[in-house]
Amino acid sequence: MKYVNFCLLAIISLVLSAVAVKKELPSTGYHPGETIPDIVLTNSEVTLQHLHDYKGKKVVVNFWAAYDAQSRAANVQLHNYLKMNHPEIEFLSISFDENRNVAEKTLAMDHLEHSAQFYEVNGTRSDLYKDFKLKRGFRNYLIDENGVIAAMNITATDLRAIFQVESSI
C-alpha cells in the first residue's frame, strides 16, 4: 500500500509540474539567431529600398528617434565607429520621428550623412514599430551576410569585440 501511495503521489506531482511549465517564452521582437524580416526603407528622397537588398553584406540596423536621447547617441556612435573602422559594413539608421524635418535637422546637428538614413513614415504607429516591439525601447541589430541576427543592442565596444573575435578565427 505504501508503494501505491508513493506511485500515485509521484504521478500526480509529474502531471502538475508538466501543466505548470510555460510552453512559450515572452517575445520582445526579433532575437539573435532568427532571420530578420524584410524591411521597406524610405530615404530622404522618398525612394524605397529593402533590407534584403543588402543580403550578402554585414549590416547594422539602428532604430532611433530624436526625442530618445539614448537611441540618438547610439546612432551617432555606431555610425562614426563603423565609418572609421569598418566601412565595408553597411549602417542603416531608421528614424521613427513623426516629423521628418525634425529627423533631418537632428542628423545635420549630429553631422551624419544622409545616405544611410531612413525614415519610417508612420512613426510609432507603423507596423515596423509594432513588429519589433520598439515601445519597450529602441534597439539595433547586427545582421550577418545571410540575413540572420548575429547580435542586438550593441555598442561600438561590442562591435569592436565581435570583430576582434571574428578576425582571430
Task: Show which residues each predicted segment covers.
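Structural microenvironment flanking redox-active thiols in thiol-disulfide oxidoreductases
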Residues: 72-110, 124-129
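Thiol-/selenol-based redox modules, centered on thioredoxin-like
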Residues: 136-169
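Bacterial Sec-dependent N-terminal signal peptides
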Residues: 1-27, 169
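N-terminal "domain-start" segment that seeds a small globular fold
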Residues: 22-51, 164, 168
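Short, internal strand/loop/helix patches
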Residues: 108-145
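Short active-site neighborhood of thiol/selenol oxidoreductases, capturing the structured segment around
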Residues: 50-72
